[in-house]
C-alpha cells in the first residue's frame, strides 16, 4: 500500500495543481469578459514641480480616482489591465506606510450603496497613473492631482469623513487624505467578496480632503491632462500653506494610539517607462490578516471564550466516551442550556481575566452560533455535548489519586437511562427535569458558572478498591444549596461504588468492602507504622454506599499478606511512576502498597490485601519477576479477644498463627509465662534507635508527668533498666498508694511504680509497633500440688532460653486471649522442644490443651 501511495502521489499533486490553475484562469477570463463594458481611464500627468517638500518623500506616489470618472483606456493601459494578476508589474515606490483603519466596519455599507447605484466596477479593473513623455518626473505627493470638477459620491464622502477622524500615519502627507474615496470603496468591495483586501495601491483610507486642502488644490499648479485629450492646461496659483497642514496632521496622528497604525514593508522596483501600481497576492492576504486582527477588545474576548468552551467540550466529551466504554454503560447525554446568562455568570468556565462585561451585546458570529446551538429547533435533534463544570481550569487529581477537599456536597447515584433533551430556558435550570442535572459551580471570585452534567456514577471495574476512580458529581442549586436526589428503587444496588452485576467480571470474591482504603492509601509514600503491622479485624462494616442502597453483597474474608522487600528491590517493585504496582493491582484485583519504616531504610514492607484469589495472583506475579524475594507472610493476625486492658491492635507486633518464627525471650514472668521479641522482623532494628532517642529526651528536666487520675491503658514513658527509658502501658491503678502497675510493651514484664515517675510520651515515640509479645507455653502446667511454677522450674526455663535464639509457633489461644506457643531451642544439630523438656525434668506436667488447636 505504501509503495502504491508513493508512486501515485507525484502524479496526483501536479494534476491537482494544474486543475486548480485552469479553474482560476477561466474564472478570471470570465470576469474580464463581464467587465469589458466598464472602462477605466487614467490621468496622465506631465512634469511635476521639482522642488518637493522633504516630508513628502516618504509618501507613496500613486493616486487613484473613483470609478465614476472613467475614460476609454489607451493601449498601454489595456495591456496593463489584461495582464494576469499573478504576474503584476514592478512598482517603484518610496517607503510605503500602511495603517489599519478602526472604521473598517463602515466600508461594507459604502460598498452596498455603490453597488445599488450601479457605480461599482469589477475588482480586477484598476486605475493606473502613467507618466508619459521624456520629461516625466516624480510627482510631489503633498499635492492632490484632481481637477476641480471632480465629483465624489455622497456615500463615499460620508465614509471618508468618518475615517478621517480616526487617525493618520505620520509622514503620509496629503496623499492619505486626498486620495479618491470611490477607489477605496471599490477595492474594499472586492475584498469583501473574496476575503482579500487590496492595499498595494495608494487608495483612499483616511478620509476626504478637508476644505482648506480642497482650496489649496484649486490654487495649485499642476500639468493635468484632460481625460479625453492628450494635452493639458496649466493652472498657476500661489504657494500653498503646506507646513501648516502638515503640523495639523502630525498633531492629530500624535493623539492616536499606536495600535491604529502599522508600517508595512513594500518592494522598491524601478521601471524605465511608466509607473504602474499593482497589488500582489501576498499583500492581499496580508491585508486580510490585518483586517481580521483589527477588531475591538470585547470581540476578541468573546472569541476566546467561545474557543475555550469548544475545546473544553471536546476534551470532556472524549473523556466521557472513554469512561462510558470502559464501564459498558450508556451515559445520559444532554445539551447545554441557552446562552442567556444573568449578569455575573458565564457560559463556560474561564478565568476571570478573560471575562467581559455581560451587559454589552457584542455581535459575534461565534456567539451567534453558540446561541443557535444552545436553543435548537424542536424538529432538529440537538447536538450531543458533554459539559463539565469546574471551578478552576487547573483542578485535577492529586498525586496519590485522592480527591481534593471540596466545598460542594458529594452524592453517589446510579447512572440513569439516556433521556431526550428538550429546549429549556435559563429560568428552569435550577429545577432539573427528568434525569438531567444542572450543576452550578461557584468559584472563588463569586461568579457562578452554569453547565450541564449527566447524573451517574462510573467506576473502573479493574480497580474496584479505588474509590477515587469513581465519577462523582457536585450537585448544587444556583443558591449554593446542596441537593441530593433520592436513590431510585433499582435492582442494581451499589457496593463500594460498583454495581452488583459488575462484580461478576472479577468473580464472587470482589464483593468484599474496602473500608480500610482511607487508612492505607499512601502507596509507596506512606510512613504510618499503623498500616505496616496492623491487626485489622477480619469483618468490616458495610460501606456508606452499601447502607444507602440497601444491598447485601456476598461477604468475603480479607486476606492480608505482608512481605519484606529489600531496599535495592523497592524501586523495581514500585516501577517507574508506580506503573508496576498499578499493574499488579489491576491484574490481581488486590490492594497493594509499599510502606516505609520510620527508623530503618534497609527493608520495607509490601502490603497485599484482598481475597485469597487476589492475594495468590499478586504473589504469583511478584514471584515471577523477583525470584530471589522471600514471599513469607510476616503479618501478625489479630487476637480473638483480650481480657486484659490493651492498646488498639494496630500498635502491637504479634506472632503469626501457624508459622514458625525466630524469637528471643526478653522477659520471663515464670516458667510458663514469657515475653518474646521477633528479632528478625524489619521493625526490630529501629528499636535500638528509639531507645537512644527516648534516653536523650527524658534525661532532660521539665518533661510533664501523667495527668491524674491516671487512665488505664494509657501509654507513657517509664524508667527501665540501667537508666534507660522504655515505653510502658498502665494496666492497673492504686489510688490509695498513688501507684500504678505498668507493663513494658517492648521488653516485657510487669512493675509497680509511683505515678510521679512516669512521663508523658511524645507521639513520634509510639509510631514503632510494640515489640514485646506476651505468650504462654502450651500443654505445660505447674505440678499438681503447686499453684505456681517452682523456682527450680523458673531457673531451668531461664537456662534454656537465655541469650539464644529460639523457634516459636502459635498453636492456640488461652481464655484471656494470650497466644499458646510451642518453643524449640536449637543445640548444634539437635532441636529440643522446651515444653517437653520441662516435663521430662519433673518441673511441670504435660496436659492436653483444652483449647482448640489452630
UniProtKB/Swiss-Prot annotation:
<dbReference type="GO" id="GO:0030061">
    <property type="term" value="C:mitochondrial crista"/>
</dbReference>
<dbReference type="GO" id="GO:0048487">
    <property type="term" value="F:beta-tubulin binding"/>
</dbReference>
<dbReference type="InterPro" id="IPR036612">
    <property type="entry name" value="KH_dom_type_1_sf"/>
</dbReference>
<dbReference type="GO" id="GO:0008104">
    <property type="term" value="P:protein localization"/>
</dbReference>
<feature type="modified residue" description="Phosphoserine">
    <location>
        <position position="164"/>
    </location>
</feature>
<dbReference type="GO" id="GO:0005741">
    <property type="term" value="C:mitochondrial outer membrane"/>
</dbReference>
<dbReference type="GO" id="GO:0005739">
    <property type="term" value="C:mitochondrion"/>
</dbReference>
<dbReference type="GO" id="GO:0140374">
    <property type="term" value="P:antiviral innate immune response"/>
</dbReference>
<feature type="domain" description="KH">
    <location>
        <begin position="558"/>
        <end position="622"/>
    </location>
</feature>
<dbReference type="GO" id="GO:0003723">
    <property type="term" value="F:RNA binding"/>
</dbReference>
<dbReference type="InterPro" id="IPR047367">
    <property type="entry name" value="Tudor_AKAP1"/>
</dbReference>
<dbReference type="GO" id="GO:0034237">
    <property type="term" value="F:protein kinase A regulatory subunit binding"/>
</dbReference>
<keyword id="KW-1000">Mitochondrion outer membrane</keyword>
<dbReference type="GO" id="GO:0019901">
    <property type="term" value="F:protein kinase binding"/>
</dbReference>
<protein>
    <recommendedName>
        <fullName>A-kinase anchor protein 1, mitochondrial</fullName>
    </recommendedName>
</protein>
<dbReference type="GO" id="GO:0005811">
    <property type="term" value="C:lipid droplet"/>
</dbReference>
<dbReference type="GO" id="GO:0071320">
    <property type="term" value="P:cellular response to cAMP"/>
</dbReference>
<dbReference type="GO" id="GO:0045211">
    <property type="term" value="C:postsynaptic membrane"/>
</dbReference>
<dbReference type="GO" id="GO:0042308">
    <property type="term" value="P:negative regulation of protein import into nucleus"/>
</dbReference>
<feature type="modified residue" description="Phosphothreonine">
    <location>
        <position position="398"/>
    </location>
</feature>
<dbReference type="InterPro" id="IPR050621">
    <property type="entry name" value="Tudor_domain_containing"/>
</dbReference>
<keyword id="KW-0597">Phosphoprotein</keyword>
<dbReference type="InterPro" id="IPR004087">
    <property type="entry name" value="KH_dom"/>
</dbReference>
<keyword id="KW-0496">Mitochondrion</keyword>
<feature type="compositionally biased region" description="Polar residues">
    <location>
        <begin position="542"/>
        <end position="551"/>
    </location>
</feature>
<dbReference type="GO" id="GO:1904146">
    <property type="term" value="P:positive regulation of meiotic cell cycle process involved in oocyte maturation"/>
</dbReference>
<keyword id="KW-0694">RNA-binding</keyword>
<dbReference type="GO" id="GO:0099091">
    <property type="term" value="C:postsynaptic specialization, intracellular component"/>
</dbReference>
<dbReference type="GO" id="GO:0035305">
    <property type="term" value="P:negative regulation of dephosphorylation"/>
</dbReference>
<dbReference type="InterPro" id="IPR004088">
    <property type="entry name" value="KH_dom_type_1"/>
</dbReference>
<feature type="compositionally biased region" description="Polar residues">
    <location>
        <begin position="338"/>
        <end position="359"/>
    </location>
</feature>
<feature type="compositionally biased region" description="Low complexity">
    <location>
        <begin position="365"/>
        <end position="378"/>
    </location>
</feature>
<feature type="modified residue" description="Phosphothreonine">
    <location>
        <position position="484"/>
    </location>
</feature>
<feature type="transit peptide" description="Mitochondrion">
    <location>
        <begin position="1"/>
        <end position="29"/>
    </location>
</feature>
<dbReference type="GO" id="GO:0071375">
    <property type="term" value="P:cellular response to peptide hormone stimulus"/>
</dbReference>
<feature type="modified residue" description="Phosphoserine">
    <location>
        <position position="524"/>
    </location>
</feature>
<keyword id="KW-0812">Transmembrane</keyword>
<dbReference type="InterPro" id="IPR047368">
    <property type="entry name" value="KH-I_AKAP1"/>
</dbReference>
<feature type="region of interest" description="Disordered">
    <location>
        <begin position="333"/>
        <end position="437"/>
    </location>
</feature>
<feature type="domain" description="Tudor">
    <location>
        <begin position="709"/>
        <end position="768"/>
    </location>
</feature>
<comment type="function">
    <text>Binds to type I and II regulatory subunits of protein kinase A and anchors them to the cytoplasmic face of the mitochondrial outer membrane. Involved in mitochondrial-mediated antiviral innate immunity. Promotes translocation of NDUFS1 into mitochondria to regulate mitochondrial membrane respiratory chain NADH dehydrogenase (Complex I) activity.</text>
</comment>
<dbReference type="Pfam" id="PF00567">
    <property type="entry name" value="TUDOR"/>
</dbReference>
Amino acid at each position: 500500500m505504501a509503495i502504491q501511495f508513493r508512486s501515485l502521489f507525484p502524479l496526483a499533486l501536479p494534476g491537482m495543481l494544474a486543475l486548480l490553475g485552469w479553474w482560476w484562469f477561466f474564472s478570471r477570463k470570465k470576469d474580464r469578459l463581464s467587465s469589458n463594458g466598464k472602462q477605466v481611464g487614467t490621468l496622465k500627468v506631465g512634469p511635476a514641480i521639482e522642488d518637493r517638500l522633504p516630508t513628502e518623500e516618504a509618501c507613496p506616489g500613486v493616486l487613484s480616482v473613483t470609478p465614476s470618472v472613467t475614460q476609454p483606456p489607451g493601449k498601454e493601459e489595456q495591456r496593463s489591465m489584461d495582464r494576469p494578476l499573478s504576474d503584476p508589474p514592478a512598482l517603484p515606490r518610496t517607503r510605503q506606510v500602511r495603517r489599519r483603519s478602526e472604521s473598517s466596519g463602515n466600508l461594507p455599507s459604502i460598498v452596498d450603496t455603490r453597488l445599488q447605484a450601479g457605480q461599482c466596477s469589477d475588482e480586477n479593473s484598476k486605475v493606473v497613473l502613467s507618466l508619459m513623455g521624456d520629461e516625466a518626473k516624480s510627482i510631489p505627493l503633498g499635492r492632490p492631482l484632481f481637477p476641480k470638477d471632480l465629483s465624489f459620491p455622497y456615500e463615499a464622502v460620508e465614509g471618508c469623513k468618518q475615517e478621517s477622524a480616526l487617525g493618520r500615519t505620520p509622514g503620509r502627507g496629503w496623499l492619505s487624505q486626498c486620495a479618491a474615496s470611490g477607489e477605496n470603496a471599490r477595492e474594499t468591495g472586492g475584498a469583501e467578496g473574496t476575503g482579500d483586501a487590496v492595499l498595494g495601491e495608494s487608495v483612499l483610507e483616511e478620509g476626504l480632503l478637508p476644505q482648506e486642502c480642497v482650496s489649496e488644490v484649486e490654487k495649485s499648479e499642476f500639468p493635468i491632462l484632460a481625460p479625453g485629450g492628450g494635452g493639458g492646461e496649466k493652472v498657476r496659483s500661489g504657494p500653498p500653506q503646506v507646513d501648516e497642514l502638515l503640523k495639523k496632521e502630525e498633531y492629530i496622528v500624535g493623539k492616536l494610539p499606536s495600535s491604529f497604525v502599522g508600517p508595512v514593508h513594500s518592494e522598491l522596483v524601478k521601471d524605465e517607462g511608466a509607473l504602474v501600481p499593482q497589488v500582489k497576492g501576498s499583500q492581499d492576504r496580508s491585508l486580510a490578516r490585518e483586517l481580521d486582527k483589527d477588531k475591538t477588545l470585547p470581540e476578541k474576548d468573546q472569541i476566546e471564550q467561545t474557543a475555550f468552551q469548544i475545546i473544553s467540550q471536546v476534551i470532556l466529551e472524549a473523556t466521557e466516551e472513554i469512561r462510558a466504554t470502559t464501564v459498558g454503560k450508556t451515559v445520559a447525554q444532554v445539551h447545554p442550556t441557552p446562552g442567556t446568562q444573568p449578569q455575573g455568570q458565564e457560559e463556560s468556565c474561564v478565568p476571570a481575566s478573560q471575562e467581559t462585561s455581560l451587559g454589552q451585546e457584542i455581535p459575534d458570529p461565534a456567539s451567534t452560533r453558540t446561541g443557535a446551538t444552545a436553543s435548537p429547533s424542536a424538529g432538529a435533534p440537538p447536538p450531543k455535548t458533554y459539559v463539565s463544570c469546574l471551578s478552576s481550569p487547573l483542578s485535577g487529581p492529586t498525586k496519590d489519586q485522592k480527591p481534593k477537599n471540596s466545598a460542594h456536597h458529594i452524592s453517589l447515584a446510579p447512572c440513569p437511562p439516556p433521556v431526550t433533551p428538550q429546549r429549556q430556558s435559563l429560568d428552569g435550570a435550577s429545577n432539573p427535569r427528568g434525569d438531567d442535572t444542572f450543576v452550578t459551580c461557584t468559584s472563588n471570585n463569586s461568579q457562578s458558572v452554569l453547565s450541564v452534567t449527566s447524573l451517574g456514577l462510573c467506576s473502573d471495574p479493574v480497580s474496584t478498591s479505588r474509590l477515587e476512580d469513581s465519577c462523582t458529581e457536585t450537585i448544587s442549586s444556583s443558591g449554593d444549596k446542596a441537593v441530593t436526589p433520592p436513590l431510585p428503587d433499582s435492582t442494581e444496588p451499589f457496593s463500594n461504588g460498583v454495581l452488583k452485576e459488575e462484580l461478576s467480571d472479577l468473580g464472587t470474591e470482589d464483593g468484599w468492602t474496602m473500608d480500610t482504603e482511607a487508612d492505607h492509601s499512601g502507596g509507596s509514600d506512606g510512613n504510618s507504622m499503623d498500616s505496616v503491622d496492623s491487626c485489622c479485624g477480619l469483618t468490616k462494616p458495610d460501606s456508606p454506599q452499601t447502607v444507602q442502597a440497601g444491598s447485601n453483597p456476598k461477604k468475603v474474608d480479607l486476606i492480608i499478606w505482608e512481605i519484606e522487600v529489600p531496599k535495592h528491590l523497592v524501586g523495581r517493585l514500585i516501577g517507574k511512576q508506580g506503573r508496576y504496582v498499578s499493574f499488579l493491582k489491576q491484574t490481581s484485583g488486590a490492594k497493594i502498597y509499599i510502606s516505609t519504616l520510620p527508623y530503618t531504610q534497609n527493608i520495607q514492607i509490601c502490603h497485599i490485601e484482598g481475597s485469597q484469589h487476589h492475594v495468590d495472583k499478586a504473589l504469583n506475579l511478584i514471584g515471577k519477576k523477583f525470584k530471589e524475594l522471600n514471599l513469607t507472610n510476616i503479618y501478625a493476625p489479630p487476637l480473638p479477644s483480650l481480657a486484659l486492658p490493651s492498646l488498639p491492635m494496630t500498635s502491637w507486633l504479634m506472632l503469626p498463627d501457624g508459622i514458625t518464627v525466630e524469637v528471643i525471650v526478653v522477659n520471663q514472668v515464670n516458667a510458663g509465662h514469657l515475653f518474646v521479641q521477633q528479632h528478625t522482623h524489619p521493625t526490630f532494628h529501629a528499636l535500638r534507635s528509639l531507645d537512644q532517642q527516648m534516653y536523650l529526651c527524658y534525661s532532660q528536666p521539665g518533661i510533664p508527668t501523667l495527668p491524674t487520675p491516671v487512665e488505664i491503658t494509657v501509654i507513657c514513658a517509664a524508667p527501665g533498666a540501667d537508666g534507660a527509658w522504655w515505653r510502658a502501658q498502665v494496666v492497673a491503678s492504686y489510688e490509695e498508694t498513688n501507684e500504678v502497675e505498668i507493663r513494658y510493651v517492648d521488653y516485657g514484664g510487669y512493675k509497680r511504680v509511683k505515678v510521679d515517675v512516669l512521663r508523658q510520651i511524645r507521639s513520634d515515640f509510639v509510631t514503632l509497633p510494640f515489640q514485646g509479645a506476651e505468650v504462654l507455653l502450651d500443654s505445660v502446667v505447674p505440678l499438681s500440688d503447686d499453684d505456681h511454677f517452682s523456682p527450680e522450674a523458673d531457673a531451668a526455663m531461664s537456662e534454656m532460653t537465655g541469650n539464644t535464639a529460639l523457634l516459636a509457633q502459635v498453636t492456640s489461644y488461652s481464655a484471656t486471649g494470650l497466644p499458646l506457643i510451642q518453643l524449640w531451642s536449637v543445640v548444634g544439630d539437635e532441636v529440643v522442644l522446651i515444653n517437653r523438656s520441662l516435663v521430662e525434668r519433673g518441673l511441670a506436667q504435660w496436659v492436653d490443651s483444652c483449647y482448640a488447636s489452630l
